Every structure is written in structure tokens, then in C-alpha cells.
Design a protein with these regions (language model features):
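Ligand-binding face of N-terminal immunoglobulin V-set domains in extracellular IgSF glycoproteins
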Residues: 119-147
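Short acidic/polar inter-strand loop motif in beta-rich domains
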Residues: 86-88, 132, 146-153
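Bacterial Sec-dependent N-terminal signal peptides
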Residues: 1-26
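Local beta-strand/beta-hairpin segments that build beta-sheet-rich folds
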Residues: 93-96, 151-155
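Extended, solvent-exposed segments with strong compositional bias
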Residues: 99-120
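Short aromatic-acidic-glycine turn motif
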Residues: 86-94, 166
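Contiguous beta-strand segments within globular domains
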Residues: 33-83, 178-194
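Low-complexity, Pro/Ser/Thr- and charge-rich linker/hinge segments at domain boundaries
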Residues: 25-31, 160-183
Length: 195
């Protein structure tokens, strides 16, 4: 009986080591740069100069991630999207439950610096995109890592929201001439989306 237990522990130990083999290790669940050569990290709504990194589910308004690599040479970077709970810890959902497409996609847009004292490469990613999109609202992390050795480069938080209802308001003045400036009415209208 003890031989079986020993073999079970050995098997479980090997299995636990292999299951995390392809994933970047040492990741944190907050905005963080793992590499000192990564600078000017911006995550914002696409087309905006500033803004909270939030998009709507099934929206045509994606997010844009931009960062500079001061190493100067081109590096193959990949990204991974992870859904989180309210405390920004990874959720228990599988990727099939919150993603459409495959995780671990390459960042394909980049540009070299021109006429600068410091040589750097700017990487640009617009997501959700045709290769990977989110199917559930919630808190998310995007992890960027080097393709060759899975070394983490940066982590950023973003939110995917879902418009389940809308509120509109209209002001109406009193019809009596003497009370026009004193009595007003606010008409609120709530609309819900069909699910």
C-alpha cells in the first residue's frame, strides 16, 4: 500500500511540474513591469490619448496596449489574457468559458525609433481582435512575455463591461407661469437589454 502512495506522490509531483511548463512564471495580478528596459507602457481605449482601460462586451471600441523596449532589437512578444474575480485573482473559469480564439498570440505591430539618442522599439497591440476576443464581462489581466523563454515583461489590468440597462432623464417645467422657476419634474426612463 505504501508503494502505491509513493508512486502517486511522484506522479502528482511530475504532473504538477508539467502542467505549468508553457506558462510564464512569477506573474503578479496588478500593473507591473518585470523588465527595467520596458518603458512608457500605456493601456487605453483605442483612438484616445488617455482613458481608463475599459471596453464593452461585443463593442467595436477595442483597447490599445503600447510599450517601448529599450533593448532596441526586435523581440518576439506574446500576450495572454486572464479573467479575474472582484479581487483581481485569477477566476476558476477555463479559457474556453471567457475567450473566443486562442490565448498566447504574438504582438505583430512594432516600429523602430528614428533619429533618437536611445535606440528602442515600440510595440503596439489592439485587442480584442480577430484572433482573440472576450466573451464575458469582468476584470481581466493582460500578461506580455518573451516568446523564446516565457520571461514575463509586463502585466496590466483592464475591465470589460456589459451594458445591461440604460438610464435617461428629462426635465419638465411646470405649465403654470408663476411656478415655472420653482416646480420642475424629472422624468427617468430605464431600459433593459434582452438576454
Amino acid at each position: 500500500m505504501t508503494k502505491i502512495r509513493v508512486w502517486c506522490f511522484i506522479f502528482l509531483g511530475i504532473l504538477s511540474r508539467l502542467s505549468g511548463y508553457a506558462q510564464p512564471t512569477g506573474l503578479v495580478n496588478y500593473d507591473y513591469n518585470y523588465d527595467d528596459k520596458i518603458k512608457t507602457v500605456i493601456l487605453r481605449p483605442y483612438g484616445s490619448t488617455v482613458g481608463f482601460p475599459m471596453t464593452y462586451l461585443n463593442s467595436d471600441r477595442p483597447l490599445e496596449l503600447i510599450f517601448d523596449d529599450l533593448n532596441g532589437d526586435f523581440v518576439y512578444y506574446k500576450y495572454r489574457i486572464v479573467q479575474c474575480d472582484a479581487n483581481w485573482n485569477p477566476s476558476q473559469l477555463t479559457e474556453l468559458e471567457y475567450l473566443q480564439g486562442f490565448n498566447d498570440q504574438e504582438i505583430r505591430e512594432y516600429a523602430y525609433s528614428i533619429n533618437t539618442r536611445v535606440v528602442y522599439t515600440t510595440y503596439n497591440l489592439v485587442f480584442p481582435n480577430d484572433l482573440l476576443s472576450v466573451t464575458k464581462s469582468g476584470n481581466y489581466l493582460i500578461h506580455v512575455y518573451r516568446d523564446d523563454d516565457n520571461t514575463p515583461v509586463l502585466t496590466r489590468r483592464f475591465v470589460v463591461s456589459e451594458q445591461l440597462f440604460g438610464v435617461s432623464a428629462a426635465l419638465a417645467s411646470s405649465l403654470e407661469a408663476g411656478k415655472m422657476m420653482e416646480d420642475q419634474r424629472i422624468d427617468l426612463s430605464l431600459t433593459t437589454s434582452q438576454r
